[in-house]
């Protein structure tokens, strides 16, 4: 298939720049790809789409304040580092600006020298491996000096950084939020659990590759980014029990889908505790092995995420749903509205 097969018209004013005051007051488009139906609703009604005995699977990753602004001690030139992933110990893969000034051995100071980075390797596209030195606990230093790395299409400053975290965010490590989860409130989750739905958590640390556009025409030539995931034995057992009892596995967001389908593909449809790196690219033609339904936000034209939704619900129907969302002025992308896909 061709990348342009997943294009659609999106007026810029529909790209949400700020979150709504109440997380669960966003709109929800409920689609059923078998019945070919679409229903306009609100997110707090997602509970009506869940049955007792289902499992609702959420990604509990937490976004790091991963954008650091510092300077080179020799020239006082300004430097920006964006932390991508922890490679080992105090070493991180980062995206550096301006990268050409940062050769192996270069140093960068942050916060009057409370945090220092030494370049130990050069990668392509402005990537660097750095080693940090600091006093105390790294995450606490990062919390005090770093800024939240908002997506490139959001131009307004975020008043409350916690609004770019899910209410169940726990495991530090993401460069971006698993945005389908931003709609849930603690109260809504309690109501869902009280209905007899199992709340299950996994972890996938979202990388910046999630925003990287597809640069090839032929999808078979696309090089998918890798992200770290983990599913505990307790979570895997719950999901196996749910499946065995005839319940559904309902994923919250594409990161949960990619984790579950990575594991399902690895273990021939079985759900096992597992951790590792995944670069699974789910596109039309893929046979789903674990996920029965899911919620997700509205994604960028020609993105791998639109392709993933199309793999589940069919390209033509998904693009029809997106046209409906545009006509009805749904809000798009990270702080936007949601879709529930049966």
UniProtKB/Swiss-Prot annotation:
Keywords: Cytoplasm, Queuosine biosynthesis, S-adenosyl-L-methionine, Transferase. Its main location: cytoplasm. It is found in: Cytoplasm. SUPFAM superfamilies: QueA-like. InterPro entries: QueA (IPR003699), QueA_dom1 (IPR042118), QueA_dom2 (IPR042119), QueA_sf (IPR036100). Monomer. Belongs to the QueA family. This is S-adenosylmethionine:tRNA ribosyltransferase-isomerase. It comes from Streptococcus pyogenes serotype M2 (strain MGAS10270).
